[in-house]
Amino acid sequence: GEIVLRIEDLDRERSKSEYIDAVQRDFEMLGLTWDRGPFFQHDRDEAYAAAFDFLKERGLIYPCYCTRADLHAASAPHRGEKLVYSGTCRSLSAKERAAKEASGRMPAMRLRTPDEVISFHDTIQGDYSQNLERDCGDFLVRRSDQAFAYQLAVVVDDAAQGVNSVVRGVDLL
């Protein structure tokens, strides 16, 4: 296999050059070299826009006007539980959407997740099954500030870069 170094820097406020330098130093300290990259997500808006348009044309995304405070109030997860989007904006009418936008709320865009169990085998965790709608809810693909969300970008990049194995924490399965 190959090691691909991708700098996931969509959040420009939190992405600083010293963090990128630290990642590269860590690779060197561990005696690792990357075969391809570094690639920077902030350079790939065109690819993310194409994927976004693909989803939109198929009716798979919809506008969401919920704030973080709204989401926490609706879900009220207990400590250690993750926030699951309840689908509040999933079925808003055009009139309801227009009223929210008239009040100044700009929507984020969410991917409509299916109400079905998805199963796969993870090399580290073993067999894994999850109902995305129930366990995760519809997730963001574009934020209200029009920046593309990590969840969209990482999938587009994995496909474009031929990534088929990723080591991440179980919380990101």
Where are the regions a protein language model picked out?
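Active-site cores that bind ATP or allylic diphosphates and position pyrophosphate for catalysis
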Residues: R68-L173
